[in-house]
Amino acid sequence: MVLIRVLANLLILQLSYAQKSSELVIGGDECNINEHRFLALVFNSSGFLCSGTLINQEWVLTAAHCDMENMRIYLGVHNESVQYDDEQTRVPEEKFFCLRSNNDTKWDKDIMLIRLDSPVNNSAHIAPLNLPFNPPMLGSVCRIMGWGAITSPNEIYPDVPHCANINLLHYSMCQAVYPGMPAQSRILCAGIQTGGIDTCSGDSGGPLICNGQFQGILHAGGNPCALPRAPGLYTRVFDYTDWIENIIAGNTDASCPP
């Protein structure tokens, strides 16, 4: 069963490439404090949770299904119970989405570009992640991260983000698991086929970083998390780079790829 992971069901595809389940995000280890300077923590007043990625001082990229009222975006966070001097909080000034057509499926265009109400300052714990300059390569080892659940189906949420490695898989592996996926889409399939490591509730909108490049935005995955042969689904960022760059440059009428 596919689940759009918004608080109760988001993904943290923590697939431990060549490692055992002692290192899970439903598995994974605590992220190094310096490896997620671009990672945004997204909340609203009711506690709805997603992640996002800072791509420059004024813009954050996340999943469209993470859109909500009263959104607050936290940057420079590591331990939710400890506030660092350089933590910064912003709210959206503008939100940009891809226009959907009648031909689009639920898998399409799950991407939201947020302009912050004021620029953030780079610091020891805050720095943007560049957009990809090459398309993703099948078989790549990819990094996932977030504050999502570390157990499933009875979710327990950590105070610190967890990180793990997964593999970029052939699209057909996700087609075989999730009924109704089209023959082609702008979705990446990533995970570990044996299961045991996975993204989970609270990780939606977070980045998939393959060979050092920001290639995916967490869209959906299996429920419960970490089942065998149930990889995660990620919006393919490379396909949207022209749209993103046009919006940032002020061309707000720019169209997304079909």
Swiss-Prot record:
Protein name: Snake venom serine protease PTLE1
Entry keywords, A to Z: Disulfide bond, Glycoprotein, Hemostasis impairing toxin, Hydrolase, Protease, Secreted, Serine protease, Signal, Toxin, Zymogen
Cleaved signal peptide residues: 1-18
One GO term (biological process): proteolysis
Superkingdom of source: Eukaryota
Record propeptide residues: 19-24
Species per Swiss-Prot/TrEMBL record: Gloydius halys (Chinese water mocassin)
Active-site residue list: H65, D110, S204
Localization of this protein: Secreted
Domain Peptidase S1: 25-249
Enzyme class label: hydrolase
